[in-house]
Amino acid sequence: MEREDDSIFLFHAPCENCGSSDGNSVYSDGHEWCFVCEHRVPANEEREAKLSTRRRTGGSKPMSYDVWNFGDSNGRYSDLTARGISKETCQKAGYWLAKVDNRMYQVADYRDQNGSIVSQKVRDKDKNFKTTGSHKSDALFLKHLWSGGKKIVVTEGEIDALTVMELQDCKYPVVSLGHGASAAKKTCAANYEYFDQFEQIILMFDMDDAGRKAVEEAAQVLPAGKVRVAVLPCKDANECHIMGEDKAILEQVWNANPWVPDGVVSALSLKDRVKEAMTSEDAVGLLFDGCQGLNDRTLGARGGEVVMVTSGSGMGKSTFVRQQALAWGKRMGKRVGLAMLEESVEDTIQDMMGLNNKVRLRQSDEVKKAIAEDGRFDEWYDELFGDDTFHLYDSFAEAEADRLLAKLAYMRTGLGCDVIVLDHISIVVSASEESDERKMIDRLMTKLKGFAKSTGVVLVVICHLKNPEKGKAHEEGRAVSITDLRGSGALRQLSDTIIALERNQQGDMPNLVLVRLLKCRFTGDTGIAGYMEYNRETGWLEPSSYTGGEGEGDTGWTEQDGQSDF
């Protein structure tokens, strides 16, 4: 019985007695207990040895062979007397003592959400650290114990996390950074969705320069409005505990102040900065490709703006935004995020490669086969994507709103994307179970606008048009009005710039596109910005010298081939 008291819970597994899929609990010494039928399997050395390779339900991988085995390493749980941490807390957390080659070590087990050990941090008496297993950049100690709630405390190291755990009787969420303060931003960004499950995120980092720097870096990539910062009277949580300042720690857990970013400054000190900003290229914004008139009317797209692109079905919206993304990423050196929800990432990549090499790659099996065989594929791919400028949302046809927003936020705060393209907003709304589409769009647009404004990203969003009640369709050259946007008034109210593409698919010049500016909050300008023409050989929307009259997109155009290829 003493042996089982020292064991720790590892994971849930099927019960061989009652058939429950996950009611059975497996422990580190090999014994099992089913909470459904109360069937107990006793521990033995053979069963314990098999635990390191036992597969979990759902086909997940076994424990890594290169992590330290509790038995082989003469492992034991013990009070950390010098740190004021009990054996019970260490057992709950998976923090144990090992004796290898007559040397003592402290071992922190890092587990995945299923409870399997994936890596460990090992520390010797001289405070030298090393890791075992697959210790990835998103590693958080104790993450497997918690899955949402009101508060979660984040500390720099395992000992501080154990301290907070000790003071709260192991009942409330606390984790520590797997790679310390220097990697706080990267670790927190990689765990954005995990932290977003909690209402408050309390950063209880060390009270030194490195800790304060880590707070500022980490807070910026965590969910907005949720971050709070703990201020302690000693260097860290464990030192407070040792010095009898437990009350100060708990006070910060429950009453830490919200994080307020740096940036409140006197206007008197901004004179030189404002002058420089007025004369910099950034003041013009990111210029649009292929239509100079659009740049003349908008002066480009600025950080924090929502740019809406709309047209009838099959009119060139996706081609237009892909072309802009390529120009911004390749020519201007901006980082670009692409959430193209109507197509797979493989299709998006092929279209971007085709545009960059002026060939309609995805539509030509002959060209695809040729470049794969003659080596051009690697050349084209590396030339466009080798500098890691483009990042894609890889969830074809999966667009649940909150999950999507978390991914977009990671593109901006974690990957540093300057521009994000969302194609299209209608598919996000249709993925919701909510019946009121108008209210859904209102909320989604409010979140998108807040996201763009708070992070400074240029957010390009595609939306569809509603079908006109009478008269010709938009696909037949009907002029687009700002009230034609399908869904809610929030689409036009919260967008900074709205660009409409018009063409007559059945007219004499079906590949000629009229570019109409419906709104520009920055300049106040509206009207026809110019014309672009689709090149069937290169896949590009190119500048056109056509100057037809407004509302007469199919009048006076000379017939070419009567075919449309958007």
From Swiss-Prot:
It holds the Pfam family Helic-prim_T7_N. ATP binds at residues 311-318. Mg(2+) 2 binds at residue 236. InterPro entries: DNA_helicase_DnaB-like_C, Helic-prim_T7_N, Helic_Prim_T7, P-loop_NTPase, Phage_T7_Gp4_N, TOPRIM_DnaG/twinkle, TOPRIM_dom, Twinkle-like. Residues 542-566 are annotated as: Disordered. GO terms for cellular component: DNA-directed RNA polymerase complex. Zn(2+) binds at residues 15, 18, 34, 37. It catalyses: ATP + H2O = ADP + phosphate + H(+). It comes from the Viruses. Keywords: ATP-binding, DNA replication, DNA-binding, DNA-directed RNA polymerase, Helicase, Hydrolase, Late protein, Magnesium, Metal-binding, Multifunctional enzyme, Nucleotide-binding, Nucleotidyltransferase, Primosome, Transcription, Transferase, Viral DNA replication, Zinc, Zinc-finger. One of its GO terms (molecular function) is 5'-3' DNA helicase activity. Residues 150-237 form the Toprim domain. Mg(2+) 1 binds at residues 156, 206. Residues 280-547 form the SF4 helicase domain. Homohexamer. Assembles as a hexamer onto linear or circular ssDNA in the presence of ATP or dTTP. Interacts (via C-terminus) with the viral DNA polymerase that is bound to DNA; this interaction is essential to initiate leading-strand DNA synthesis. The priming complex consists of 2 DNA polymerases and 1 helicase-primase hexamer that assemble on the DNA template. Interacts with the single-stranded DNA-binding protein. Part of the replicase complex that includes the DNA polymerase, the primase/helicase and the single-stranded DNA binding protein. The N-terminus zinc finger domain is essential for delivering the primed DNA template to the DNA polymerase. The central core domain contains the primase activity. The C-terminus region is responsible for the helicase activity and binds 1 Mg(2+)-dTTP. This is DNA helicase/primase. It comes from Enterobacteria phage T3. The gene is 4.
